[in-house]
Curated annotation (Swiss-Prot):
PANTHER family xref list: ATP-DEPENDENT CLP PROTEASE ADAPTER PROTEIN CLPS (PTHR33473:SF19), ATP-DEPENDENT CLP PROTEASE ADAPTER PROTEIN CLPS1, CHLOROPLASTIC (PTHR33473)
Biological function: Involved in the modulation of the specificity of the ClpAP-mediated ATP-dependent protein degradation.
Subunit-level organization: Binds to the N-terminal domain of the chaperone ClpA.
GO-annotated biological processes: protein catabolic process; proteolysis
Residue ranges with Basic and acidic residues bias: 14-24
Residue numbers spanned by region Disordered: 1-33
Name of the protein: ATP-dependent Clp protease adapter protein ClpS
Length: 122
């Protein structure tokens, strides 16, 4: 086994003379700037209409995967039905991709052609 070696830490106050790599402007206060954080971009999760998926199934999807109550889910389903598509929510990219994948997988398992995709929010 090796014997522990002794380490001596020195601080600037221990050596008042400036080191050769230090600036001559000793005593200047420098304020560190905080990084500017940007919120992550948001993505729309969009449901598209088709001629085969039952309306009740679309309402169920909205309730289960987007935590909507029956009234809101019905309104979104009617928008999908009458306008061809509707936004189900805004999420970060990872969450939006996961929700779209879950909806598409559930629709396929239930043998419905319901399509869910994501679009970048403008």
């Amino acid at each position: 086994m090796h014997a522990p070696s002794q380490i001596r830490l020195t601080f600037n106050q221990d050596h008042p003379e400036p080191h050769e790599h230090e600036d001559e402007g000793a005593g200047l206060a420098v304020q560190e700037s905080k990084p500017v954080l940007q919120p992550p971009p948001l993505y729309k999760v969009v449901l598209f209409n088709d001629d085969y998926t039952p309306m009740d199934f679309v309402v169920e999807v909205l309730e289960v995967f987007f935590n909507m109550d029956r009234e809101k889910a019905t309104k979104i389903m009617l928008t999908v039905h009458t306008q061809g598509k509707a936004v189900c929510g805004l999420f970060t990219r990872d969450v939006a991709e996961t929700k779209a994948m879950q909806v598409n997988q559930y629709a396929r398992e239930s043998q419905h052609p319901l399509l869910c995709e994501i679009e970048k929010d403008s």
